[in-house]
Structures are given as structure tokens and as C-alpha cells.
Regions:
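Mature extracellular/secreted ectodomains of secretory-pathway proteins
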Residues: 77-131
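N-terminal segment immediately downstream of the Sec signal-peptide cleavage site
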Residues: 31-100, 158-174
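Bacterial N-terminal signal peptides
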Residues: 18-29
Length: 174
């Protein structure tokens, strides 16, 4: 009887130990996935990017939310393209269609974060056909623990040179 009790106790002990190790491994994996949900804002004033080949600029306004683990994004806003003289030649709306990547750079608080977001958008020009598959990069750089507002950027297609405006990321859920 005592041998049987020892065997059962040892079996339960080994099972509990294995279960504990499994739970510990799962917790370690979850804590190291760097799961995060962020909001991004283009505005205050809206960022402007220059196309160095044409001299045209694009002004992007809007906001969105993305999840780094689910690789999802929802976002929308408006845009305008101006010629090299500053006259608006196109207006429309944009919508986020695909999350690509996010490089978190931290920040002074969850409400103010730096980073680089890569996504794909569709442009809906007024009076024109939708333009799909357009790459967009939102940049809110942090250098040496401080924001570099001069390099904030919402690059869209060939519009890649920062030309003023504000972008910001907000950490909603770590």
C-alpha cells in the first residue's frame, strides 16, 4: 500500500511540475511577443512630404489604430497634393488597407511614443479612380530620448522628404 501511494504521489508531483513548466514557458512567450496596440495621429499641423523629383507636396491628415501582434491596422483621413508653386492640384481621402511593420522607439509616456510605422493605403482622389497598394510610412522619431519634430513624416509613395507637420503615436495597450 505504501509503495502504491508513493507511486501515485510521485506521478501527481511529476504532472504538476510539468504543468508548471508549461505555464511558465507560455507566460515567457506571451511576455516576449511585445504585443502592443497603438494609435497614430497625423495632424497639429498635418505632416507634409515632398516629392524630390517633381517638387510637389502631399499633406496627410487623419488617424488610425494598429496591433503589432495581430498585424492589423484601421485608419483613414484626407490628403491634398500641391504643385511646386503651392497650388492644390488634387484632394481626396485615404484608407489604411494593410499593416506591414512597426519599430517602436519608446517615449516619455504611453501617451507620447516614437516609432516608424509601415503600412499600405488606398487613395481616393475626388473625381478619380482609387489608387490601391500605395506604401505609407509614418515617422515620429525619438533620438537620445527626445523627439525630433523636424523629421516627423508621413511618406506616401514618392513623397518621401519631410516638409513640416506633426505625427505622434499613442500606446493604448502594451
Amino acid at each position: 500500500m505504501s509503495i502504491r501511494r508513493l507511486t501515485i504521489s510521485h506521478g501527481w508531483s511529476a504532472s504538476l511540475r510539468s504543468l508548471g513548466l508549461l505555464l511558465l514557458a507560455l507566460l515567457f512567450c506571451v511576455n516576449n511577443t511585445k504585443a502592443a496596440v497603438y494609435n497614430f495621429t497625423l495632424g497639429g499641423p498635418p505632416p507634409v512630404a515632398l516629392n524630390p523629383n517633381t517638387g510637389q507636396t502631399i499633406k496627410m491628415a487623419g488617424s488610425g489604430t494598429f496591433d503589432t501582434v495581430a498585424a492589423s491596422v484601421v485608419g483613414a483621413g484626407s490628403y491634398s497634393i500641391s504643385n511646386s508653386e503651392g497650388r492644390v492640384i488634387e484632394r481626396g481621402n485615404w484608407e489604411a488597407t494593410q499593416f506591414s511593420d512597426f519599430e517602436a522607439q519608446g517615449g516619455p509616456s504611453p501617451g507620447i511614443q516614437g516609432g516608424i510605422l509601415h503600412l499600405t493605403i488606398t487613395l481616393f482622389p475626388k473625381g478619380g479612380d482609387p489608387v490601391t497598394g500605395v506604401p505609407m510610412t509614418v515617422v515620429c522619431p525619438v533620438e537620445d530620448g527626445a523627439f525630433d519634430e523636424d523629421d516627423d513624416l508621413a511618406a506616401v509613395g514618392a513623397f518621401t522628404v519631410p516638409h513640416g507637420g506633426i505625427t505622434v503615436f499613442h500606446l493604448l495597450r502594451p
